[in-house]
A protein has these predicted regions:
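Conserved, structured core segments of small domains
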Residues: 1-125
């Protein structure tokens, strides 16, 4: 089984408070369906992109911390799922349901690297 990121995109000026009760129930129902199928590993909603902080290493080795997202675009990731699926087609089937429930575009990407279960963060054992 492979794991996939399903990223939900929102406009730069998206206000999470406008989400309707019906939309939230559809998202909760989809999450329950994903859990029952053993597909959902993690689900998260993110604060608006304007709340982000970005860090960039400078030529002198110091880190520059700036307000706002790393890239300046009209859409940003507003939330995501980490799913386990047999293949890309299965991940896309879940992503279709996510796009409908969230009423937003989604992007699907396979996760290429996962630490081994015994591996500590940072790569040491």
């Amino acid at each position: 089984m492979s794991q996939y990121l399903v990223a939900i995109y929102r406009s730069d000026d998206y206000d999470p408070s406008v989400e309707t009760e019906a939309m939230m129930e559809e998202i909760h129902a989809l999450n329950r369906e994903m859990i029952a199928a053993g597909a959902r590993k993690l689900a998260c909603g993110l604060s608006p992109a304007g709340n982000a902080k970005s860090l960039r290493k400078q030529p002198d080795g110091k880190l520059l911390v700036t307000d706002g997202p790393y890239t300046e675009t009209k859409e940003h990731i507003g939330g995501f799922w980490i799913l386990e699926a047999a293949d890309l087609d299965e991940a896309l089937a879940w992503a279709r349901k996510g796009a409908i429930a969230c009423r937003a575009p989604v992007e699907v990407r396979e996760i290429l690297f996962r630490p081994a279960p015994t591996q500590e963060p940072g790569g040491s054992k």
